[in-house]
């Protein structure tokens, strides 16, 4: 079974995939937002390519656990993504995922300039790995 991780941003959407048996998430691609219908179609194409059976959307909570506008955006997007993919979609707390993604990219020697195109997919991998780790026995 494979799971798709989604880091939903206002400009870009990061995507990652995990094999639940291997329990490791990896960044796959970044979708530049062009409108919800096109965004959903692009995500669905990746989901089909990787034969995912579930998706996890990052829920950007504030540090105190409250929800702001970005969290409401994710909550609204999740059911539409579920309908587009035809697989269950869960929300998962993504606090500090972008910070962790930037840190991982820096550790691999990716320059700040080059991170812009990779940080969203890496953040999706951070979100998805956190979800996998939380489900570990």
From Swiss-Prot:
Keywords: Cytoplasm, Hydrolase, Nuclease, Ribosome biogenesis
Single GO term (MF): nuclease activity
GO cellular component, one term: cytosol
Enzyme Commission number(s) of this protein: 3.1.-.-
Superkingdom of source: Bacteria
InterPro entries: RNaseH-like_sf, YqgF, YqgF/RNaseH-like_dom, YqgF/RNaseH-like_dom_sf
Localization annotation: Cytoplasm
Primary residence: cytoplasm
Broad EC category: hydrolase
GO biological process: rRNA 5'-end processing
Gene3D superfamilies cross-referenced by the UniProt entry: YqgF/RNase H-like domain (3.30.420.140)
Function: Could be a nuclease involved in processing of the 5'-end of pre-16S rRNA.
Database matches in HAMAP family: Nuclease_YqgF (MF_00651)
Similarity section: Belongs to the YqgF nuclease family.
Protein's UniProt name: Putative pre-16S rRNA nuclease
């Amino acid at each position: 079974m494979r799971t798709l991780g989604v880091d939903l941003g206002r400009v870009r959407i990061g995507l990652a995939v995990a094999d639940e048996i291997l329990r490791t998430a990896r960044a796959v691609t970044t979708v530049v937002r062009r409108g919800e219908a096109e965004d959903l179609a692009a995500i669905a194409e990746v989901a089909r390519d990787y034969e995912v059976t579930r998706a996890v959307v990052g829920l950007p909570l504030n540090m105190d656990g409250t929800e702001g506008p970005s969290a409401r955006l994710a909550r609204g997007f999740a059911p539409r993504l579920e309908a587009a993919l035809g697989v269950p979609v869960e929300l998962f707390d993504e606090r500090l995922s972008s910070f962790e993604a930037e840190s991982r990219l820096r550790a691999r020697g990716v320059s700040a300039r080059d991170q812009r195109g990779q940080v969203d997919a890496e953040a999706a991998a951070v979100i998805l790995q956190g979800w996998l780790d939380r489900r570990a026995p």
